[in-house]
Amino acid sequence: MISKEQKLALIKEFGGSEKNTGLAEVQIAILTAEISNMTEHLKMHKKDIPTRRSLLKKVAQRRHFLDYLVKKDVNRYKEIIEKLGIRK
């Protein structure tokens, strides 16, 4: 889980303002931060199956947002992938 401060920083960076939380880029950025935190946790706790399941759910959720972004605006998709360092 990421802190409120980290989440607010991501919202400001990718959404433009604090209230623009529904933007696909914001959702993808938040999910990416949560995924990286869970990945670090799983490196230390290899047998934590519930966290692994949650990680897979978040990866699938991020994939849905990315697919949506590809359909709506390919340029925004390419920008977010480049900024976050996500594979295609």
Swiss-Prot record:
GO biological-process terms attached to the record: translation
Keyword Nucleus: no
GO molecular function: rRNA binding; structural constituent of ribosome
Keyword Metal-binding: no
Gene Ontology CC annotation, any one: cytosolic small ribosomal subunit
SUPFAM superfamilies: S15/NS1 RNA-binding domain
The protein's assembly and partners: Part of the 30S ribosomal subunit. Forms a bridge to the 50S subunit in the 70S ribosome, contacting the 23S rRNA.
Protein name, as recorded: Small ribosomal subunit protein uS15
Organism, as annotated: Mycoplasma capricolum subsp. capricolum (strain California kid / ATCC 27343 / NCTC 10154)
The encoding gene: rpsO
